């Protein structure tokens, strides 16, 4: 019985280590291997596995609701994510930047 337990443990470990091996996500004609990221304009893509499925995660700037006394300042369009995203500056804190 202990040999069976060792064999099952070995196979489960091997499967966990090879999940997603050789697989990739497609983004605009290029492939991102599982476990890697790709920077593109103001987006960051990550190819990952989730419950034995290959998934593509995309991070991009969120729209912000600007409160009274604050203003939105555009980010540098040539900067990598998240430095390309706009920031919110408010009176009394960072207004004079």
Curated annotation (Swiss-Prot):
Keyword Acyltransferase on entry: no
Statement: the UniProt record of this protein carries the keyword Secreted: yes
UniProt entry keywords in alphabetical sequence: Disulfide bond, Secreted, Signal, Toxin
GO CC terms, sorted: extracellular region
Tissues and organs where the protein is expressed, per its UniProt entry: Expressed by the venom gland.
Note: Negative results: this recombinant protein is not able to act on sodium channels (Nav).
Family to which this protein belongs: Belongs to the scorpion La1-like peptide family.
Protein name: Venom peptide HsVx1
Species in which this protein is naturally found: Heterometrus spinifer (Asia giant forest scorpion)
